From Swiss-Prot:
It catalyses: hydrogen sulfide + 3 NADP(+) + 3 H2O = sulfite + 3 NADPH + 4 H(+). Keywords: 4Fe-4S, Amino-acid biosynthesis, Cysteine biosynthesis, Heme, Iron, Iron-sulfur, Metal-binding, NADP, Oxidoreductase. Binds 1 siroheme per subunit. The keyword Heme applies. Alpha(8)-beta(8). The alpha component is a flavoprotein, the beta component is a hemoprotein. This is Sulfite reductase [NADPH] hemoprotein beta-component. GO terms for molecular function: 4 iron, 4 sulfur cluster binding; heme binding; metal ion binding; NADP binding; sulfite reductase (ferredoxin) activity; sulfite reductase (NADPH) activity. Pathway: Sulfur metabolism; hydrogen sulfide biosynthesis; hydrogen sulfide from sulfite (NADPH route): step 1/1. Its EC number is 1.8.1.2. Disulfide bonds: none annotated. It comes from Serratia proteamaculans (strain 568). Its cofactor is siroheme; [4Fe-4S] cluster.
Amino acid sequence: MSDKHPGPLVVEGKLADAERLKKESNFLRGTIAEDLKDGLTGGFTGDNFLLIRFHGMYQQDDRDIRAERAEQKLEPRHAMMLRCRLPGGIISPQQWLGIDKFAQESTLYGSIRITNRQTFQFHGILKGNVKPVHQLLGRLGLDALATANDVNRNVLCTSNPVESELHQEAYEWAKKISEHLLPRTRAYAEVWLDQEKVATTDEEPILGATYLPRKFKTTVVIPPQNDVDLHANDMNFVAIAKNGKLVGFNLLVGGGLSIEHGNKKTYARQASEFGYIPLEHTLAVAEAVVTTQRDWGNRTDRKNAKTKYTLERVGVDTFRAEVEKRAGITFEPIRPYEFTGRGDRIGWVKGIDNQWHLTLFIENGRLLDYPGRPLKTGVAEIARIHKGDFRLTANQNLIVAGVPESEKAKIEALARDHGLIDDGVSVQRQNSMACVSFPTCPLAMAEAERFLPEFVTKVEGILHRHGVGDEHIVLRITGCPNGCGRALLAEIGLVGKAVGRYNLHLGGNREGTRIPRMYRENINEEEILREIDQLVGRWATERTAGEGFGDFTIRAGVVRPVVDPAQDFWD
């Protein structure tokens, strides 16, 4: 990942069609407002199909009934998925009750999906409810601007309820970074909130008239927890504290997990260390990284457009020097930091401010009223009495934060009564995660969310059989190679290849600092479980004291570590 063969700063050639679309969109307006009035189709047409992503929505359909509807000569059952902008994942109980009501009354699935980017998604919003949901968010003090497409997406922040003051400072920076890098266009306010058109010309001083070459993801991380998986992100601010107070950030740039099956020009990559900056330079440096990627990112090939590929093409040193020049700063040497894990601390923890925080494990992040487990109703009941806030975590869990001692018993009783606390959940299940995939994701190649629960049960059985039932392996399943489930930072990562078939990756670590290598390609569940059974058996008997499964697979030579992904990811 050093400057081996620096390439051109700008890639010349025919621009990808997405660049035309953005240029002609009139700063993201397109004809969305007119399309909303078209009752002949349940979807958005032409360029609007992609433009709505800048407004936080993806057009989807129910893939379980797609073929049936085609036979009936009907268009797919179009519905939108909406993703809220929620930097740092903090939401008030009052806001929660508003989104809970909408999910129940105005979506096809009646669920709220907590995502591993610390926000929530609604699935199954019919076209007639699209404008009302944006207006509801507006009334709640929320929005969905820039949670998808070629912009800086929802900014993550480590969920650290214990060190309350440090977390609050880091969270404030996550919010500031999010606001600073937002699109300036008034399109969102005009289309969804009916704000009047202003007779001034739109300008995008940071993102530019054609926005970024590709999506861009940012985190604020508080060591020793790497719950946000910084190496999956383009730009990362690692908090450096002195006496419990935030003093600055280490900057790491160029992480990303998305690949394309069989395309060896694509690869997962860890972020590179750029250096340390004091707090006062944070926004200038964030802007400089984004504008450098804006100007140098590949706009001719979207498969090669992310920051990680720009870094590899121009060289880390060249990119870093440009950021220094644009921000008017010089990076100081990286300050020491260490990650020890990335899972959430499930259950009650007490903060240094004497407030209590309850982390609820939500399998797959899916809040729905299941038979005998009315999870969604339970969270709403807690919201009705809770005086603190809710925090959505990057592990798809929910923290009831800021609970005084006097309210603890009441909130725990509500959580238990609604199935939100289950003492029988294993540590393995708590450390397993999947993306949404079927039936709503149009990119899904294999099951993920619906596959995970039963698959984890089988893995639990393997662990128990080998006498390591109290241990865990970071396990992630993603339904396609785009990386949403962050399987390419797991100790065991399954990447969907086709229905019922996955690529099996091994060799990540618990801290999330190593890319796992593909071990077996295109295998089914039975074959995957056979491989896991054999390897867990070896791990249980051959491991050193405290050695994690991923570290063992590297040391034992089961897989070679990915050292320089641009060169050896596919070896």
